[in-house]
Amino acid sequence: DRDSCVDKSKCSKYGYYGQCDECCKKAGDRAGNCVYFKCKCNP
């Protein structure tokens, strides 16, 4: 679920958020983004 994406997904300092994005999509959200090195899902 989306909370596990926040914990699991690494957000690097150069904004690579593929892992976060993928996790959020699997959780049923539209996309994922990195905010202050944390993964956030966009419903």
UniProtKB/Swiss-Prot annotation:
Its main location: secreted. It is found in: Secreted. Disulfide bonds join 5-23, 11-34, 20-39, 24-41. Keywords: Disulfide bond, Ion channel impairing toxin, Knottin, Neurotoxin, Potassium channel impairing toxin, Secreted, Toxin, Voltage-gated potassium channel impairing toxin. The keyword Kinase does not apply. GO terms for molecular function: potassium channel inhibitor activity; toxin activity. Gene3D superfamilies: Knottin, scorpion toxin-like (3.30.30.10). GO terms for cellular component: extracellular region. Expressed by the venom gland. Reversibly blocks Kv11/ERG potassium channels. Belongs to the ergtoxin family. Gamma-KTx 4 subfamily. The presence of a 'disulfide through disulfide knot' structurally defines this protein as a knottin. Has the CSalpha/beta fold, which comprises one or two short alpha helices connected to anti-parallel beta-sheets stabilized by three or four disulfide bonds. This is Potassium channel toxin gamma-KTx 4.1. It comes from Centruroides limpidus.
